[in-house]
A protein has these predicted regions:
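Junction motif at the cytosolic side of a transmembrane helix
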Residues: 209-213, 226-251
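Hydrophobic alpha-helical transmembrane segments of multi-pass membrane transport proteins
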Residues: 33, 53-125
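Transmembrane helix segments
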Residues: 37-42, 158-199
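Alpha-helical transmembrane segments and their short interhelical loops
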Residues: 96-166, 222-230, 234-240
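Hydrophobic alpha-helical transmembrane segments of multi-pass membrane transport/permease proteins
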Residues: 18-44, 54-72, 112-114, 167-177, ...
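Aromatic- and glycine-rich beta-strand/loop motifs that create alpha-glucan
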Residues: 1-30, 84, 250
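Short hydrophobic, aromatic-rich alpha-helical segments embedded in or entering the lipid bilayer
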Residues: 3-9, 181-223
Length: 251
């Protein structure tokens, strides 16, 4: 009888990934470095409804780090296929759907690390916001980042090679740009960005700080980022399910 969940596999997989130094450099070190660079200007003096500019930079980059971690872990499935690890796991009582659920949970556990580290460093180096704002923004960005675990898994299912990790992680840079994380967008580019997956996650996460304001004249409706995330969860979830059915759950 197949099982949908294995605490032992979840623990082993999470520890294995956290021991990979290169993963930690890109998911934790890079967002921290970018925060220190981007917040070194006048962001601390720029006030927003829920905090200062440094707090917004911190939430955006913590969300980026969490999303990068999730995408890389989802795409790691392609490498595990080549090494035969996925086949070994599926020889146990863990079902293919259960395996996908385990990957999602592993991604969330690992994604919590950059979220906590970046926000913690920010809160102690000039970023100002209430603890309720930090908590709400952090939890929202953390849960929203799971969307990119599905994206990474889909890339792995389509590519079925170790290049999937590079493609998935590299795509996050483009998504982050369109998600209004690296720089404010305007005009037609902003209109396009509203329909991209990272925009929904980043805007929902930063809303406790910005209250939805992108600039002095543009406010994103409360429903829009959640609708965007919901639509992308549906699209990527269905696509992953179809690809898994197409491969017959084979490793």
């Amino acid at each position: 009888v197949s099982i949908p969940f294995s605490p032992t596999y979840l623990r082993i997989d999470t520890v294995r990934i956290l021991r990979n130094v290169s993963n930690l450099v890109f998911t934790i070190g890079l967002p921290v470095f970018m925060y220190l660079v981007f917040s070194s200007g006048q962001t601390g003096d720029f006030q927003l409804p829920g905090g200062n500019g440094a707090a917004l930079v911190a939430v955006n980059l913590a969300t980026y780090g969490a999303c990068t971690a999730c995408a890389a872990i989802g795409a790691l499935t392609a490498w595990e296929r080549q090494q035969g690890w996925t086949r070994q796991v599926l020889l146990t009582r863990l079902s293919p759907v259960g395996f996908a659920v385990q990957k999602l949970l592993t991604a969330l556990l690992v994604a919590a690390v950059p979220m906590v580290v970046v926000l913690g460093i920010a809160a102690s180096t000039g970023a100002e916001a209430s603890w309720q704002t930090w908590l709400t923004a952090g939890v929202t960005g953390w849960l929203g980042s799971s969307l990119f675990a599905l994206f990474g898994l889909l890339v792995a299912l389509v590519m079925r090679s170790d290049s999937a990790i590079g493609i998935a992680s590299g795509s996050l840079v483009v998504f982050a740009f369109l998600g209004n994380i690296f720089m404010p967008l305007s005009g037609w580019l902003l209109d396009l960005a509203r329909f991209t997956p990272m925009f929904g996650v980043a805007n929902a996460a930063s809303r406790p700080v910005t209250h939805g304001w992108l600039d002095r004249t543009t406010q994103v409706p409360l429903w829009q980022p959640w609708a965007t995330m919901g639509a992308w969860f549906l699209v990527l979830g269905v696509a992953c399910a179809l690809m898994m059915r197409r491969t017959g759950g084979r490793a």
